[in-house]
Amino acid sequence: NAINNVISFDGSETKGNKCSNVLVPVDFSNYSLIACDAAFRYAFRHNLNVCILHSYISESYSETLPPGIKIFSERIRKEKSTEKKDIAYKQMAVLENEIREQIAKGVFPDVKFEVVVEEGIPEDVIAEYSNKNMPAIIVMGTRGKHQKDEDLIGSVTAEVIDSAEVPMMIIPNGINPTEVVPVKNIAVYCNLDQSDVETFKMFFSRFDTVDCNVSLVHIKGKREKFVIERIDAFCRYCNAEYPYCTFEERLFDENTFLDEFDKYLKEKETKLLVLPNKKRNIFMRLFNPSIAHKVFFHTDIAMIVIPTHLNE
């Protein structure tokens, strides 16, 4: 069979960890509460707990001058670090009270949650917690596409995208979490290789997908061969493996992808975009950013980023 010679989807099982909570990194902005909303809805539907995590950068992290050159004395540095710590704990207490009020009003589902405040660089603290506890998912809020470059949590989100070992849910400011958890119209970017099987198994095992409309999308490279045959093969695999969803295919030209993709998402009223993402070193991230990274800065749509671990 010609198509089987092009690509084979064997449906082999992927390894997974037993996960018991949803991790929500926050910076106390307005969209932190939106992220908490989405996280609590997801946790409720999947019988999980929520961990709300904030990290603050003390003076020991913020000093960037060469050794021997100090702006503050040790006493002042400790005072400033203590002040930042106190502010972080007070802000977390305010957020915790607001969440409890939302639960009491019935706005947030009543799920068990904890709050954690840690000293350190945000993306490092998130990675350390995630690697230690292996949450089911990381949920992060962010600004709209025109403001992400100006925003701390936006840049942190971009860093976590490229380093996370567990799925991420990214909720832009202005998105209604009720349209994301659960969701009906989904677009999934496909690499058209075996990693797609891994992506789909993880996604369909962790998200409500019954009666979903799924668009399988791919960027057609100039030197890429058998693209139509490969996406047809994967669409048939999906229809057989997930008969409770409907699937359609869409190919994009690499030169016009971002603009055309944005139009396509609006046309299909897509509420959630699923993107596989392979871990990259800093050189690759700077000079050859991933599709997930590009789309993150270009769209205002909720995203699920799923790490893939198969070799290139």
Enumerate the predicted regions with their spans.
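Small/aliphatic-rich secondary-structure junction motif
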Residues: D10-K78, K184-R250, T270, H298, ...
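Active-site phosphate/pyrophosphate- and oxyanion-stabilizing loops and adjacent acidic/basic residues
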Residues: A158, K201-F204, R236, D262, ...
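Intrinsically disordered or low-complexity boundary/linker segments at protein termini
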Residues: N1-I34, G106-D110, A136-K148, L152, ...
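A short acidic, glycine-rich active-site loop
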Residues: S73-K90
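Structural beta-alpha unit
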Residues: N5-N17, S60, D86, N97-I138, ...
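Charged helix-capping and loop-helix junction motifs
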Residues: I153-V156, R230-F234, F287-A292
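Short, small-residue-enriched loops and turns at beta-alpha junctions
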Residues: P177, K222-F226, N281-I282
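Short beta-strands and strand-loop turn motifs
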Residues: V139-T142, I170, S215-H218, V274-N277
